[in-house]
Design a protein with these regions (language model features):
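Catalytic phosphate/metal-binding cores of nucleic-acid and nucleotide-processing enzymes, i.e., regions
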Residues: 62, 95, 120-123, 142
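Residues at or immediately preceding the N-termini of alpha-helices
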Residues: 58, 120-123, 132-135, 152
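Conserved donor-nucleotide binding/catalytic region of nucleotide-linked donor-dependent transferases
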Residues: 125-145
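Nucleotide-sugar donor-binding catalytic core of glycosyltransferases
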Residues: 1-110, 116, 148-162, 166
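Alpha-helical elements of Rossmann-like donor-binding domains used by nucleotide-donor carbohydrate transfer enzymes
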Residues: 122-126, 141, 154-162
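Short amphipathic alpha-helical surface patches that serve as generic macromolecular interface elements
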Residues: 81, 111, 120-124, 139
Length: 166
């Protein structure tokens, strides 16, 4: 896990950095108020033109995410998003919300790779039950899953495995 931050080095408990660019995203992301329960929550809304510019470069975005323990996953234009893969690869434990599709060839397992909440009201209690040791275990599970499924070598090996099983 070279280059990944330890528990102590992560200064952000929970994060969501995303935006709303169309009515579908607005409907999926703005129904509930997640900003009160996520420590660093940024979701500028611009439906139509001009589209809001990203506040952060890709490197700045990934640096902020890498400083986080947990990352909120909200559905966007569709049920799948790159955000989950970014979180898993950086060892950030995803917080899945209703409408997020987390089905993969190798299934993610609740309370092993991610936590699930149905509403903002559940977030604090769920996060408070995860101590340093449990978070480290979950974070390592996330990184291992990413390496097996999404890293260049892992995704190649997985593709070969799937083809061989056809």
């Amino acid at each position: 896990n070279k280059g990944l931050k330890s528990y102590k080095e992560r200064k952000i408990k929970s994060i969501f950095l995303g935006k709303v660019e169309n009515p579908v995203q607005f409907n999926n992301r703005a129904k509930l108020n997640w900003s009160d329960v996520i420590d660093l929550f940024e979701m500028p809304i611009s439906q139509g033109y001009p589209v809001a510019k990203y506040k952060y470069t890709q490197d700045e975005y990934l640096e902020l995410v890498s400083q986080s323990l947990f990352g909120l996953c909200l559905p966007g234009y569709g049920p799948k998003c790159n955000r989950e893969i970014e979180l898993l690869g950086l060892g950030v434990v995803p917080i899945f919300t209703p409408g997020v599709d987390n089905t993969y060839y190798e299934p993610l397992i609740e309370n092993k790779h991610y936590i699930k909440v149905n509403s903002p009201e559940e977030v604090k209690n769920k996060l408070d039950t995860i101590n340093k040791n449990k978070w480290e275990e979950m974070s390592n599970n996330c990184i291992s899953w990413y390496n097996r499924n999404c890293s260049p070598k892992g995704s190649f090996d997985l593709t070969i495995k799937i083809i061989n099983n056809i």
